[in-house]
């Protein structure tokens, strides 16, 4: 398949159409095709096409947001880490926030939908456990510039899509992925992070692919070794059977019953 031509066609349609929902579905479908054919592509090609598709999808999501009159794309609850009182807070577009703004000591509860978090320090991000609605068919999560935080998502509110974490340091990342679906996890520029990526159901046999790039001293919990495939795009000589000790390793560490505040106190 000529992914370059397909991506250019999506970019052309984005500049001409107002039917962003249909274009979003086509883009997600192309991402699925890329994942299916990834074994026949070089690491560079996979990374290049994946980045281009994600950029198109990000532009489509922005257009969808604008077309809805800047309605909120998701809702979460926010509280100071010193307070037990949750307050409903409408999302502000992180892309418009000044790059120097850093949020300190906040607790975010993800409830549904596409989500983006940026410039957090000594914060926690968890997913609600009492949500009774249906998960969306597709979506994306993005975390950027995260320092000394706990990301503990035991539920993700879409069935197919991607999680992208970049520029993350000294943090704890727990994810529960629906591995029976087309689901992409990408980690870029992570340093000294402890990571636990579990499957939605222990009965799911397929492995979850995790793409990493420019990562350093990251620890994946040893219990996840059998169901993860780590693809290091910074190391073209790495195979699925080996790990680059300077980038990542599988080791045991205390998961603190997956309790967010216990993790925060234990490691941060």
From Swiss-Prot:
Q: Which GO terms describe its biological process?
A: post-chaperonin tubulin folding pathway; protein folding; tubulin complex assembly
Q: What is its main location?
A: cytoplasm
Alphabetic keyword roster:
Chaperone, Cytoplasm, Cytoskeleton, Microtubule
Q: C-CAP/cofactor C-like domain: which residues?
A: 98-255
Identify the GO cellular component terms for this protein: cytoplasm; microtubule
Which PANTHER family does this one have?
Answer: TUBULIN FOLDING COFACTOR C, TUBULIN-SPECIFIC CHAPERONE C
What is the stated purpose of this protein? Tubulin-folding protein; involved in the early step of the tubulin folding pathway.
This one is known as: Tubulin-specific chaperone C
């Amino acid at each position: 398949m000529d992914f370059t031509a397909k991506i250019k066609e999506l970019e052309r349609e984005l500049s001409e159409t107002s039917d962003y929902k249909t274009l979003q579905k086509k883009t997600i479908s192309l991402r699925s095709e890329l994942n299916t054919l990834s074994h026949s592509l070089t690491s560079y090609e996979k990374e290049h096409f994946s980045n281009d598709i994600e950029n198109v999808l990000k532009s489509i999501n922005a257009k969808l947001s604008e077309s809805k009159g800047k309605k909120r794309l998701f809702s979460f609850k926010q509280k100071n880490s010193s307070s037990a009182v949750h307050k409903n807070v409408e999302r502000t577009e992180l892309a418009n926030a000044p790059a120097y703004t850093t949020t300190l000591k906040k607790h975010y509860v993800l409830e549904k939908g596409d989500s983006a978090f940026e410039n957090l320090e000594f914060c926690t991000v968890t997913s609600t456990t009492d949500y009774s609605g249906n998960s969306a068919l597709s979506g994306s999560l993005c975390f950027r510039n995260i320092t000394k935080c706990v990301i503990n998502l035991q539920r993700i509110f879409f069935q197919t899509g991607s999680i992208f974490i970049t520029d993350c340091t000294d943090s704890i990342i727990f994810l529960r992925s629906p591995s029976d679906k087309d689901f992409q996890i990408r980690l870029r520029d992570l340093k000294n992070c402890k990571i636990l990526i579990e499957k939605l159901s222990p009965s799911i046999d397929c492995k979850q692919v995790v793409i990493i790039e420019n990562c350093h001293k990251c620890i994946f919990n040893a219990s996840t070794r059998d169901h993860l495939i780590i693809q290091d795009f910074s190391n073209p000589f790495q195979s699925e059977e080996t790990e680059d000790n300077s980038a990542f390793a599988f080791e045991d560490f205390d998961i603190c019953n997956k309790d967010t505040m216990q993790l925060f106190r234990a490691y941060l």
